[in-house]
Amino acid sequence: MRYIKFFKELNNKNVNLVGGKNASIGEMFQELVPIGIKVPDGFAITSEAYWYLLEQGGAKQKIIELLENVDATEIDVLKIRSKQIRELIFGTPFPSDLRDEIFQAYEILSQQYHMKEADVAVRSSATAEDLPDASFAGQQDTYLNIKGKTELIHYIKSCLASLFTDRAISYRASRGFDHLKVALSVGVQKMVRADKGSAGVMFSIDTETGFKDAVFITSAWGLGENVVGGTINPDEFYVFKPTLEQNKRPIIKRQLGNKTQKMVYAPRGSEHPTRNIKTTKKEWQSFSLSDEDVLILAKYAIEIEKHYSKEAKQYRPMDIEWAKDGESGEIFIVQARPETVQSQKTKEENQVFEKFKFKNPNEKKEIILQGRAIGSKIGSGKVRIINDLEHMNSFKEGEILVTDNTDPDWEPCMKKASAVITNRGGRTCHAAIVAREIGVPAIVGVSGATDSLYTGMEITVSCAEGEEGYVYAGIYEHEIERVELSNMQETQTKIYINIGNPEKAFSFSQLPNHGVGLARMEMIILNQIKAHPLALVDLHHKKSVKEKNEIENLMAGYANPKDFFVKKIAEGIGMISAAFYPKPVIVRTSDFKSNEYMRMLGGSSYEPNEENPMLGYRGASRYYSESYNEAFSWECEALALVREEMGLTNMKVMIPFLRTIEEGKKVLEILRKNNLESGKNGLEIYIMCELPVNVILADDFLSLFDGFSIGSNDLTQLTLGVDRDSELVSHVFDERNEAMLKMFKKAIEACKRHNKYCGICGQAPSDYPEVTEFLVKEGITSISLNPDSVIPTWNAVAKLEKELKDHGLTAR
């Protein structure tokens, strides 16, 4: 056949003939199907067929005339011309020989699947599409559940006409592509019955930070167009590549999306071949993929990335669409293309750490809305609410675009925006992809944004605070901090990072560092669990109906309270451990005080009213108590899961507020019973050296544990007898006090005597350079800092160590 190529005949060398999408499907069919990756079969109608059609009746010349002198920024003119061109293509009849070839290929495909008329997807594939430096994805149309020759011909024509939508013309103009040098091929691919299963998008790289060692997967019930189009908020998963390849099960994040609707087949004879129906409560409260499915997809992503990188002779992260057949249970890859944002950063750009931050971070700001952050920038301006494309011409440069959901035709408008906010969508929808590519901060999945905001309202959009994006009332000034990482000198003293928010882990791992000196368990409990641990242990007792319902809503997607608690904690710790792997990550077990626990959901039923909670029921004393022991065992199970199931053996454990040697023995026994034993698979167990008794009896504590991490905050409070929360005596609280320096010195010396680890993770080194200098000279193993202190402290330590070396001195 002259104008038809079956997928098995194609590979990536055929881009000019069948476009990037079809060439890539052919490549996978030839190279990846043999190693077990499933790809639905089909055929491509070549770009030669496109030119053949345009030669009929002089259509090509008419298109040239209609595009002459069109300014892509003149939205009204662009809309008129693009509509005229599409109508022209629709009105041009298929030559009979081309139509006959299409029908013959369709018959062969139907017979292959033992069907009279196969249900197929009809997809556009532009000859300049899916190249590493351009994201044509979604600019031309895709049609699902097409069945029969009449429908097939109609939707192939629809695909060809979609080469001239407003956005497609605008994009080509902005990238310097000649409109008549970009052709369109059409792919016809057997449908996967995802209408009875699930579908989505995955990337072999983190789309926000460029972290290379994670596969990011989005998923929803039904056909995948809702995920791609951003009309629902999908489930999200992260899988860590290095330990997955060691046959571990490193699902380091699961996030349940609301998935309010799903796309299914429409009855034959309907106006459209697919339709959306509401999901059931069970569906939106359940993950649309099992853990096994997530791991299969991640393995597919790794193999696809390896193949395309090998072929390109350079690292090539991939953007992949997948579908799970609800009838057979099989998972298929339906498209794969190079990722177009993170992969395009130059080596020089990757050597610069760029951080957007508010000029006055302590200024009080009113959060009015929040959703999923896209990118890491900040934008501010006046709101412009646009509910449909007809009003796009009212949008002014620098305004903030607020709409229900952006589809590919919105790009001319998005390019003018200082930020974008949508009611719906996830991190892999077209709006998110385009926002990343043009460098505009966007927040998607902001329920009710178009109702809560109004045109002309002044707001600030921040995507610089982690995975969650915030909309603030008013305009707040921001600045950009840029640091050249290539100039950083190595240090002998290890520089670690303190981290409490797993969502920032991938970003913070790009700072110069030797690992994590303090990962705060309690921050994960506070932000992910939200309920008192004992309220979960004891879910069916002592609960009001309201409280019980709130807790059950938090647990949606998980089998039971224990499954929820253990997996959520493991995911948070796993995310941090993966981000810094294989560098050490020291996790401090939970260290809430009773008044802090009391404020959590259900907490008032379990906590005493203490006069001085700072010195009360906290730390190790809580772990072995009869009332809290089971909750701590769950915590231990989560830590063991990170090391054993996820394979993240770089994670170490640290016990806070340990008062006596006897307490130490009790806690170690609980850890041992929960598969956390010092020395097993390289595990080290430290304690926070934050009580004077830890220093006074350092030799005894170090005979039980593998090292100290000095907690300068509590150690200063308890050595100087100062309530660190009291303003009346705050002037006395000073880690530079001579007594404190002696405490630090004694702790370091004790660790050296026992040849054990000694670090510091309190606030002192972040605040006082002279304390850092003292610790370096005393020979401390590591200094763990708040992220904003890492670079200046690193440079100061490198300079100090060089000066010591130049004078023939070394740390003690």
From Swiss-Prot:
The reaction takes place in three steps, mediated by a phosphocarrier histidine residue located on the surface of the central domain. The two first partial reactions are catalyzed at an active site located on the N-terminal domain, and the third partial reaction is catalyzed at an active site located on the C-terminal domain. For catalytic turnover, the central domain swivels from the concave surface of the N-terminal domain to that of the C-terminal domain. Keywords: ATP-binding, Kinase, Magnesium, Metal-binding, Nucleotide-binding, Transferase. This is Phosphoenolpyruvate synthase. It comes from the Bacteria. InterPro entries: ATP_grasp_subdomain_1, PEP-util_enz_mobile_dom, PEP_synth, PEP_util_AS, PEP_util_C, PEP_util_CS, Phosphohistidine_dom_sf, PPDK_AMP/ATP-bd. GO terms for molecular function: ATP binding; metal ion binding; pyruvate, water dikinase activity. The N-terminal domain contains the ATP/Pi binding site, the central domain the pyrophosphate/phosphate carrier histidine, and the C-terminal domain the pyruvate binding site. It comes from Helicobacter pylori (strain J99 / ATCC 700824). Its EC number is 2.7.9.2. Its cofactor is Mg(2+). It catalyses: pyruvate + ATP + H2O = phosphoenolpyruvate + AMP + phosphate + 2 H(+). Substrate binds at R520, R588, E690, G711, S712, N713, D714. Belongs to the PEP-utilizing enzyme family. One of its GO terms (biological process) is gluconeogenesis. Mg(2+) binds at E690, D714. The keyword ATP-binding applies. Catalyzes the phosphorylation of pyruvate to phosphoenolpyruvate. Pathway: Carbohydrate biosynthesis; gluconeogenesis. The active site is at H430, C761. PANTHER family: PHOSPHOENOLPYRUVATE SYNTHASE.
